[in-house]
A protein has these predicted regions:
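Cyclophilin-like peptidyl-prolyl cis-trans isomerases
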Residues: 2-7, 16-225
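Metal-dependent nucleotide-binding catalytic modules
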Residues: 10-11
């Protein structure tokens, strides 16, 4: 299995996919067929196709999955989310003004799930802000479990990466994901689930109390005692 990592060159930003060069050259892919670009913004509609990400920054992200665009990729994401595969996985590659990538349980960007890689399902949906798309290697048929969320449009990715959904709520939470490759203190997916499962937000551990030095008055009081 080739290990997906996002990294191909887009306006000076690397956006290919794996330090190991793919042996197979990119196959010629036919132009995508016309598709319905409608995005239902109500997460209560068709909750079986709404992915919910609860992040360690305390926010929640709702993603409208589009099986009409990429049926096999949507099914893979739903299966892995249902198995708890993404729980605890970090955003290991987060580039300001570009995208946030996750989906590798090793946190290195060089791994994925034990499942077989997927055949590309490139489509006409544009890579706009909030787009959720699959990471892959130079081999077009190497997407597995890693995906990325766009901070800003990058139309150079259209028809080169499988676009399978769009953020419909919580883009401010996405914007708050810690930057870095990898970040020093990465944001995690605490819980990934489908809206149909109606899972409550996980309770996050409280941050440790900050240490403070004693005040002058406290020092003087201790001396007088």
């Amino acid at each position: 299995m080739r290990l997906p990592v996002l990294a191909a060159a887009v306006f000076g930003l690397a956006l290919i996919a794996s330090p190991i060069a793919a042996k197979k050259k990119e196959a010629l892919v036919p132009p995508p067929a016309p598709i319905d670009m409608t995005i239902d913004l109500d997460p209560s509609h068709d909750p079986e196709n709404v992915l919910v990400l609860d992040l360690s920054n305390g926010g929640r992200v709702d993603i409208r999955l589009k099986p009409q665009w990429a049926p096999a990729h949507v099914e893979r994401i739903k299966m892995l989310a249902g198995q708890g595969f993404y729980n605890g996985v970090i955003f290991h590659r987060v580039i300001e003004g570009f995208m946030a990538q996750t989906g590798d349980p090793t946190g290195t960007g060089q791994s994925g799930s034990p499942l077989p890689d997927l055949k590309a399902e490139f489509n006409a949906a544009p890579h706009v802000r909030g787009t959720v798309s699959m990471a892959r290697t130079n081999d077009v048929d190497s997407a597995n479990s890693q995906f990325f969320i766009m901070f800003y449009p990058r139309f150079a990715l259209d028809n080169k990466y499988t676009n399978f959904g769009r953020v419909i709520s919580g883009m401010d939470t996405v914007d708050a994901i810690v930057r870095g490759e990898p970040p020093q203190n990465p944001t995690k997916v605490v819980q990934a689930s489908l809206a149909s499962a109606n899972k409550p937000r996980p309770v996050l551990a409280a941050a440790p109390a900050a240490l403070t030095a004693p005040s002058i008055d406290e020092l003087n009081a201790s001396k007088s005692n």
